[in-house]
């Protein structure tokens, strides 16, 4: 099958997965709230155990004010004032929901309240462009990106269509994160023709220390693109410019090893580098996140092995992927992330996750993100739950653990081919007080808080960040670790 036909199948299938979204919408008043916490602190009058993996009881549209962390896909989160605001794709479990970009907010990253929608209908400029090109716009907006420039709030959105690659990325602005939002214009478009270009969806933006701005976008057809913006308007610096490709992935027998999309870009001042997070594979099953980094926003972005992200290979590290701890069905479809800061400078990683018992549910997962000493990001194996940042003592580490090495199997293709989520399953290991490791891994361990070093018998080393955490599978406090081994494979663990 020609490669472009594979891409078209991917686009059509993606539309089908999100086809639960339909017409009309309006701004609603925020849900009442008596929350008073902040990230890193506990709150009152809320039972964290009430957060379920599936949510049939609140799925009906009439209960949208109770959705909280449910029905979330492709979130973009930023802290504005007292609240973290989350803007996300128009989706709903088993129902028809209104389009317009869903808005939620939280004071503590655990309790979320549904606020409303950005738009009361499909943005006129984007819908008109698609209609002018002979298409019919989807009744859904996808993958927003939110930011603040000066006193202006900017929200980039994607509007696509059943016509392959006929899509737009538009910009709306507001004086408040609650809106009202007004269209400013189209930033970049893509069409169903014979040109070489990626699909104009999945925007993300970085502002350099000098004030320059760049938009990164794309899905399938031709990888991830970068486009220079005019910081004064948020639109393309050169009208009609599509930008250039900056990241790609591998092929097998002329077929992509899976989708590449859902980029997130940040600048990390402590390391002076730009980090590009990219979603690989099918969104309902094998979805996982890769990271590359660069000294300049225009690249080249390099992977763990120093290979240019624009090379036709699959890049590492893969910092999160479908996984399963003991006593739980597992989580899959866990990528297209947002990376953001709290007021104390701590980083967080958030995305949707789908419970493997029924992957049609879509839950918001927020996790702490940590930095290795050599500048690579790693994420917690468990969701954030108000845990503090106190150092864990060496005596606390001895005992029984579950360990997951995030390995990967290539399955070229999209939804039809990538049916198996390839859950990475935990294995038991024991850290003995005498410094030995036994179980699924044999070797020795040493600890200098917060770093746990494991030397594997037969070769290989692991450097792991140790942190307090919550065992969500067993609903109790625990200790977690996350890090990379010497080959760039992510390694997770939690104490039993």
Each model region followed by its residue ranges:
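Short, intrinsically disordered, low-complexity terminal segments
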Residues: 7-8, 16, 36
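Carbohydrate-active catalytic/glycan-binding domains of CAZyme proteins
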Residues: 27-496
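Alpha-helical transmembrane segments and their juxtamembrane interfaces
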Residues: 18-19, 300
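N-terminal amphipathic alpha-helix initiation
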Residues: 13-14, 69
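C-terminal motif of bacterial Sec signal peptides marking the signal peptidase cleavage site
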Residues: 21-24
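N-terminal leader/targeting signatures
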Residues: 10-12, 18, 42
């Amino acid at each position: 099958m020609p490669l472009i036909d594979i891409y078209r199948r991917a686009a059509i299938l993606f539309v089908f997965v999100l086809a639960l979204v339909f017409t009309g919408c309006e701004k609603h008043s925020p849900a009442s709230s008596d929350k008073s916490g902040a990230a890193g602190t506990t709150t009152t009058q809320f039972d964290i155990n009430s957060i379920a993996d599936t949510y049939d009881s609140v799925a009906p549209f009439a209960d949208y004010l109770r959705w909280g962390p449910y029905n979330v896909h492709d979130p973009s989160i930023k802290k504005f004032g007292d609240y973290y605001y989350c803007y996300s794709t128009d989706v709903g479990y088993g129902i028809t929901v209104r389009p317009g970009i869903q808005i939620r907010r939280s004071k503590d990253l655990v309790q979320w309240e549904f606020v409303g929608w950005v738009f009361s209908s499909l943005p006129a400029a984007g819908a008109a462009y698609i209609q002018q090109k002979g298409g019919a716009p989807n009744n859904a907006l996808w993958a927003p990106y939110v930011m603040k420039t000066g006193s202006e709030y900017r929200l980039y959105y994607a509007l696509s269509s059943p016509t392959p690659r006929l899509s737009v990325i538009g910009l709306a602005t507001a004086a408040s994160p609650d809106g009202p939002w007004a269209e400013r214009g189209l930033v970049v478009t893509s069409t169903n023709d014979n040109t070489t270009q990626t699909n104009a969806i999945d925007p993300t933006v970085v502002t350099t220390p000098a004030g320059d701005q760049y938009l990164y976008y794309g899905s399938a057809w031709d990888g991830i693109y970068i486009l220079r913006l005019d910081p004064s308007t948020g639109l393309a610096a050169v009208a009609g410019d599509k930008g250039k490709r900056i990241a790609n992935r591998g092929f097998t027998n002329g077929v992509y090893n899976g989708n590449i999309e859902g980029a997130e870009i940040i600048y990390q001042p402590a390391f002076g580098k730009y980090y590009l997070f990219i979603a690989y594979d099918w969104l309902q099953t094998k979805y996982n996140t890769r990271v590359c980094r660069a000294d300049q926003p225009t690249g080249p972005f390099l992977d763990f092995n120093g290979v240019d992200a624009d090379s036709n290979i699959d890049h590492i590290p893969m910092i999160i992927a479908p996984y399963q701890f003991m006593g739980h069905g597992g989580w899959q479809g866990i990528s297209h992330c947002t990376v953001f800061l709290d007021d104390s400078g701590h980083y967080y990683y958030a995305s949707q996750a789908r419970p493997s018992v029924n992957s049609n549910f879509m839950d918001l997962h927020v996790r702490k993100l940590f930095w290795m000493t050599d500048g690579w990001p790693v994420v917690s194996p468990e969701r954030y739950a108000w845990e503090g940042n106190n150092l864990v003592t060496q005596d606390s580490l001895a005992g029984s653990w579950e360990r997951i090495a995030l390995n990967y199997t290539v399955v070229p293709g999209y939804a039809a081919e990538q049916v198996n989520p390839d859950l990475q399953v935990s294995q038991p290991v024991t850290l003995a007080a005498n410094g030995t490791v036994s179980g699924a891994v044999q070797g020795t361990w040493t600890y200098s808080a917060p770093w746990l070093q494991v030397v594997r018998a037969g070769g290989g080393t692991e450097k792991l960040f140790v942190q307090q955490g919550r065992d969500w599978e067993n609903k109790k406090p625990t200790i977690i670790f996350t890090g990379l081994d010497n080959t760039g494979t992510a390694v997770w663990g939690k104490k039993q």
